[in-house]
Amino acid sequence: MASGDVRINVAVADRILLHLWEQDHQADHYLVSFEMTRPGIAEVCALHPPNVSRAMRELIQDGLVSEYTRTIRGDERRQKTWQLTDEGRTEARNRIEKLRSMMVLIREREGKLLEIRADKAAEHLQTGLTLLQVLM
């Protein structure tokens, strides 16, 4: 049964680090997907594009993210993209461990609310949701 207030509020920096972690297979590639650009990050992380830029400046200053200009699949022009630094990968892993243990509410087929760890929600729902999608 669900307890008290279990609204999830994931910090902007945590959303971005988690997203870049999920896209880390594209690190150091010449050609990357839309999800590595400012509009792509904004869309996936449910942020306004100016907030992505502001957060990226802070993450770059903290040494967690690096910025590149790359070719985007399906787009003729090059765009700014970001990826995790080695320090950013370590920090992302630490934050992901905390995010995985957060409790979320899901509704079962019978309509009953169930409070469950975020990292177990996709499996329980039998979906391919990422941790970020569960937390959003």
Residue ranges and their predicted role:
Residues 9-10, 29-34, 49:
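Alpha-helix N-cap/helix-initiation sites
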Residues 27-43:
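Short acidic, hydrophobic short linear motifs in intrinsically disordered regions
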Residues 46-61:
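Short amphipathic alpha-helical interaction segments
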Residues 1-26:
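Short alpha-helical segments that sit at the start of domains
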